[in-house]
Amino acid sequence: MESLRELYKIGVGPSSSHTMGPQKAAFKIKETYQDANHYEVYLHGSLALTGKGHLTDKIIEEVLGKENVEIHFVSEELPKHPNGMIFKVYQDDKLLDSITVYSIGGGALLYDDDNLQ
């Protein structure tokens, strides 16, 4: 059973899956790839279609730095969930990694890579 702290969270924006989840994912990416200095983020499905209104792009820019991130809106859903994101992580011009993550509600995340869970 979930604790009350898991059930009731205060976040930015009107939708936890569109702000808390992407914010948490961006923090995890930043923490995991400390040498990165540029990011491309692809918001898929529902995140792409309603992300601007729900401030998804703004919360990611806030975490990764507006000058360091390019955000792309892709209407097609990824296979596992309507709220999919792909983070491409760079150091200078070298691609360090590409991470697929899903914001599944309430700030919870599902990564394609089990090492990031």
Residue ranges and their predicted role:
Residues 1-11, 37-41:
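Short, hydrophobic/aliphatic alpha-helical segments
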Residues 8-26:
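Conserved phosphate/anionic-ligand binding catalytic regions in large, soluble enzymes, centered on
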Residues 13, 47, 105-107:
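A generic structural motif
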Residues 19-23, 54, 81:
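Electropositive phosphate-/nucleotide-binding environments in soluble metabolic enzymes
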Residues 24-34:
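Small-residue-enriched alpha-helical segments and adjacent helix-cap loops
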Residues 28-30, 57-61, 114-117:
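Generic alpha-helical propensity signal that fires on short helical segments
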Residues 38-74, 82:
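A structural-propensity feature for long, helix-poor, extended segments
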Residues 63, 69-117:
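C-terminal regulatory domains involved in ligand/effector binding and gene-expression control
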